[in-house]
Structures are given as structure tokens and as C-alpha cells.
Regions:
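A cross-family acyltransferase "interaction/gating" segment
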Residues: 129-188
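Generic beta-sheet signal
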Residues: 93, 119, 147-150
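Membrane-anchoring hydrophobic helices of lipid-metabolizing enzymes
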Residues: 1-57, 81, 198-209
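Catalytic-site beta-strand/loop segments enriched in glycine and acidic/polar residues
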Residues: 105-137, 141
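Catalytic core of membrane glycerolipid acyltransferases/transacylases, capturing the structured
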Residues: 40-97, 141
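Short, hinge-like loop/turn segments at secondary-structure boundaries
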Residues: 85-87, 109-110, 162-169
Length: 209
């Protein structure tokens, strides 16, 4: 569970988060493949502990083309409320609750050209462990997975399962858009696991702790 102080931050209106980012943080974007401008109908993955200022740093042109798969847990409600302020659509569901509806919604979103975003180690971990869901979805639609991270130069870590990060004032927030990974079609269980590990490693390569 997220601590109460972080939960309250999730309820700040978007303009407050934007002002906090503009005043207290320096922002950088690393997007060597120009995916913010061009990516459509892709699956994206970002670790759970990077979510606090992620929507404020993510450019608007990318946000409006993104649908996020968000846990049906109480923590997921905080995330859903936060991203809705920024124009990101949320689909609630997980492997234990509402998973079928979330998968159906994600399928429709990809078909409509939206990017579908996952926090693949949420909502309960283990930390930095990729779930199979993004791999299964990308394989079923023969689409790419794009690793995305937001790295703070200085931050506090909360004592939660994922060591949730709160960037310190006047630190630098760097949005890193990784190299797209082409997922083969119709993977079997062994193939899903093989590519799960490949995507996990690719996301870790752009994750700075």
C-alpha cells in the first residue's frame, strides 16, 4: 500500500503538479527514436515506483494517445484519479480482479491506435519484476513494447514494497524512452517467459536508482 502522504499527493489537481514540476524540478527528455511524436498502437511499460510525477513530465501529445491499465486495488484508484487530471484514460483491472475487462479494453485501444501503458510490477510486486500481461498483449497483436522510465537525480524512498520514489526539490527528472522491442506473434508459454525477461532487462537498463 502507498503511504497516506503519497496518496494525498495523487489527489492534487493537475495544474498544481505541473506548477510543482515547473518550479522545483528541472526536466529532461531522452527520446532518441522520436517515439513521443510517432508511436501509435504500442504497449509501454514503466515501473510502479516512478509514477508520482510521470504524467506531469510526459508530454501532452503523448498523454492524449495513451490508455493506462491500472490496478483495481485502492492504490490503483489513486493512480487512476491522478492520470485522469492529465487526460490519460484509465482501464481498471489486474490478474486477480477485472483482468478480462481490462484485456478487452486494451485490445480495443490498440486497434484504435492508442498506446497501452502498464506498470508491470504493480500493484504488489515483486519490485522490478515484469508481469506476463504486456508480453501476451503485444504478442497477440504483433506490436512493439516500449520501455519508459522517469529517473530523478535525487529522491526520497518510501518504505513500501517498491520503495516508491518522491523526487527531492530542485532535482532533475529525466524521462527516458527506450528502444522499441518487437514481440513475435502467437508466443507459447515458453516464448512469453523468454520475452518477459528480455523486456524486463531492457526496462532495467534505462532505470537509474
Amino acid at each position: 500500500m502507498l503511504c497516506k502522504s503519497v496518496a494525498l499527493l495523487f489527489f492534487f489537481p493537475s495544474f498544481i503538479l505541473k506548477c510543482v514540476c515547473a518550479i522545483f524540478f528541472r526536466r529532461k527528455i531522452s527520446d532518441p527514436h522520436n517515439l513521443i511524436e510517432t508511436a501509435a498502437g504500442c504497449v509501454t511499460v514503466t515501473w510502479h515506483n516512478r509514477l508520482l510525477f510521470f504524467p506531469a513530465v510526459f508530454p501532452k501529445k503523448a498523454r492524449i494517445r495513451t490508455v493506462a491499465v491500472v490496478s483495481a486495488s485502492r492504490d490503483g484508484q489513486y493512480v487512476s484519479d491522478l492520470i485522469s487530471f492529465f487526460g490519460i484514460k484509465a482501464m481498471r483491472g489486474s490478474s486477480k480482479k477485472g483482468g478480462a475487462n481490462a484485456l478487452l479494453g486494451a485490445t480495443r485501444a490498440l486497434q484504435d491506435g492508442f498506446n497501452v501503458s502498464f506498470t508491470p510490477d504493480g500493484p504488489r510486486g515483486p519490485k522490478y519484476t515484469m508481469s506476463r500481461g504486456p508480453i501476451y498483449l503485444a504478442s497477440a497483436h504483433t506490436t512493439r513494447i516500449i520501455p519508459i522510465s522517469i529517473n530523478a537525480s535525487r529522491y526520497w524512498s518510501i518504505k513500501s514494497w517498491d520503495n516508491f520514489q518522491i523526487p527531492k526539490p530542485f532535482s532533475t527528472l529525466t524521462l527516458v524512452i527506450g528502444t522499441p522491442i518487437e514481440i513475435p506473434a502467437n508466443l507459447d508459454a515458453g516464448g512469453i517467459e523468454e520475452w518477459r525477461l528480455k523486456v524486463q532487462n531492457a526496462l532495467m537498463e534505462i532505470t537509474a536508482d
